[in-house]
């Protein structure tokens, strides 16, 4: 098992990665001070039948353990489920010494984390990710729910007590979820570990290579990229925005196509390609966009739909959290491993997006 130490201004904790990491969950809970009074596990209908009982059995403790299960899918990261989780917590007599365990992918981590951040003004929680995508969202303390007008618009910064990354849980993932999570791995490599980027190009020829020791290697390299950035900027006042590389267009695509119709990672992959496409123009550099495009397509990432309204996408990009005074701010790449947040005029984005759409385009429906 590998341990990755996360240090922020508000909290220090460890990410436990490996085939036996779940066996440490009881010790993690027992070592908490003040002692944990009871435990609420929040999961979804896709994960709970597969892994909920395994986690309950792993918790060799005397305290009451109960679960709250929501439907699966990004659209379930809603105020309705957030409110229902609070109702369940109150009915089961959670208190300020209770613990919430987030068992699932990024959607569950965000929802459960925000419940923990807000219940009685904040209680402890532990992340138990079950997807590759969650290697990003489980670390760093950003928790949120969606609003009909935008993704992750209602939330908080609330660091977990620990992250338990039990890699056998990932083996039940469908292919599209491996691909979705791998996009965030690529993102971390491109913005913060060029050596990892070259390793991925050499060692991960297909998504089937994301298994066993290679998976653990990837997690132990990608997670520290985020950890180092979060250590510098916990509440996204500066460099933490670099982690949004590919997300400005990616989130707009998720919103426009409808949550669940495109995975987060697929949206981010298209967004990263667009960011590289635009970066070449803004910085007058060669970032090997064509080569990068072919590399992404090899893994099955989608092309940019040609029939989506560029005007609508630009409007959605202006609702992005990085936007300021109605101006789009995007994370662009000067060179591999060096990115910056750049203010881009609407017209520039519009022209570039039309050209990118023409280059990449397929029909979305």
Swiss-Prot record:
Catalyzes the conversion of 3-deoxy-D-arabino-heptulosonate 7-phosphate (DAHP) to dehydroquinate (DHQ). Belongs to the sugar phosphate cyclases superfamily. Dehydroquinate synthase family. This is 3-dehydroquinate synthase. GO terms for biological process: amino acid biosynthetic process; aromatic amino acid family biosynthetic process; chorismate biosynthetic process. It catalyses: 7-phospho-2-dehydro-3-deoxy-D-arabino-heptonate = 3-dehydroquinate + phosphate. Its EC number is 4.2.3.4. The gene is aroB. It is an enzyme of class 4 (lyase). InterPro entries: Dehydroquinate_synthase (IPR050071), DHQ_synth_AroB (IPR016037), DHQ_synth_fam (IPR030963), DHQS/DOIS_N (IPR030960), DHQS_C (IPR056179).
């Amino acid at each position: 098992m590998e341990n990755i130490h996360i240090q922020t201004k508000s909290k220090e904790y460890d990410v436990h990665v490996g085939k036996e990491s779940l066996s440490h969950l009881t010790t993690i809970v027992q070592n908490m001070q003040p002692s944990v009074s009871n435990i609420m596990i929040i999961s979804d209908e896709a994960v709970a039948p597969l892994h909920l009982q395994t986690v309950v059995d792993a918790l060799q403790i005397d305290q009451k353990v109960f679960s709250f299960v929501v439907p699966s899918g990004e659209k379930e990261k809603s105020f309705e489920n957030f409110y229902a989780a609070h109702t369940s917590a109150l009915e089961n007599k959670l208190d300020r010494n209770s613990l919430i365990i987030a068992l699932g992918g990024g959607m569950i981590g965000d929802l459960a984390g925000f419940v923990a951040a807000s219940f009685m003004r904040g209680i402890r929680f532990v992340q138990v990710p079950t997807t590759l995508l969650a290697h990003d969202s489980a670390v760093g303390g950003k928790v949120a729910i969606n609003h009909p007008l935008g993704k992750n618009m209602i939330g908080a910064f609330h660091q977990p007590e620990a992250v338990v990354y039990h890699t056998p849980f990932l083996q039940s993932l469908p292919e599209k979820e491996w691909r979705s999570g791998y996009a965030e791995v690529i993102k971390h490599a491109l913005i913060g570990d060029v050596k990892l980027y070259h390793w991925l190009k050499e060692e991960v020829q297909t998504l089937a290579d994301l298994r066993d020791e290679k998976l653990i290697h990837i997690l132990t390299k990608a997670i520290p990229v985020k950890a180092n950035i979060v250590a510098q900027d916990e509440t996204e006042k500066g460099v933490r925005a670099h982690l949004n590389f590919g997300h400005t267009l990616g989130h707009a695509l998720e919103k426009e196509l409808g949550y669940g119709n495109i995975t987060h990672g697929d949206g981010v992959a298209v967004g990263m390609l667009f960011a590289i496409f635009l970066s070449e123009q803004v910085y007058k550099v060669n970032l090997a966009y064509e080569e990068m495009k072919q590399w992404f397509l090899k893994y099955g990432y989608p092309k940019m739909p040609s029939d989506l309204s560029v005007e609508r996408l630009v409007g959605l990009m202006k609702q992005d959290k990085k936007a300021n005074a109605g101006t789009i701010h995007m994370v662009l790449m000067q060179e591999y491993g060096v990115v910056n947040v750049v203010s881009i005029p609407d017209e520039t984005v519009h022209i570039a997006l039309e050209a990118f759409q023409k280059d990449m385009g397929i029909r979305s429906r």
